[in-house]
Amino acid sequence: MVSRVIYRPFEKDDFSALASILKDTWHTYVPNQEYNALEAACDLVHSLEISSFSQVVLVDDVPCGIVLARAEGDRLPHAKECHAAMDAFLERMHKLEPKATDEYLSFLEAEQRVNSRLLEQSGLARASQITLLAVSGTARGLGIGSVLLDAATSYVASRGAEGLYLYTDTDCSWKFYERRGLKRAAMYRANREERHVLPREMYLYGMDLSA
């Protein structure tokens, strides 16, 4: 049976399904599934906060993937609303699992520190950013990730971007980006002390859009 596939901008009703994709992909370390769901929701709302472009794929009316991006100089229309939502999620997380929440906040702080270093090393500080790309495990292998990435690339190019970048790491499918023409522009290897909060290696991938 042929599935019905639709691409369109993010809508609020997509949030729960997309957060569930993030949970199943990256937020599985705590036995408390309610906490894991909140942590994934926190990640999604943060990505929405720093983005100005969205594209969601629906397969048979079910959200199965999302790409978010920000072109250099874009306004961030949802920043205030998303920041408040993130604070609310963090409060609920802390009530459920205070230790896990503290570890999550330590991860965010360390991740931001490393990402800033990667961006400085890459020379792409004025490029546009792909802030999130996630596809449900049930929809992988169908070319959906490539379509979503192309949509974000086309958007930032239409805004005059001469380059784009994204962050990824050894917990993600970084080889996908190499197959799509992005090149590794910077790398960071976590030291022994950092490995309890950070992935083994973290990368910045970039693409030249000036041609």
For the regions a language model picked out, list residue spans one by one:
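A short beta-loop-alpha structural element at the N-terminal edge
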Residues: 4-20, 71-72
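Helix-loop element at the rim of GNAT/NAT acetyltransferase active sites that forms part
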Residues: 20-36, 73-76
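Active-site rim helix/loop that mediates acceptor-substrate recognition in acyltransferases
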Residues: 33-59, 64, 68, 89-92, ...
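Conserved acyl-donor/pantetheine-binding loop and adjacent beta-alpha core of acyl/acetyltransferases
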Residues: 73-128, 192-197
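Conserved GNAT acetyl-CoA-binding A-motif
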Residues: 127-128, 156-169
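Conserved acetyl-CoA-binding loop-helix of GNAT-fold acetyltransferases
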Residues: 135, 141-154, 179
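Conserved active-site alpha-helix within GNAT-family acetyltransferase domains
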Residues: 146, 170-187
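Conserved catalytic-core motifs of GNAT/GCN5-like acyltransferases
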Residues: 165, 183-201
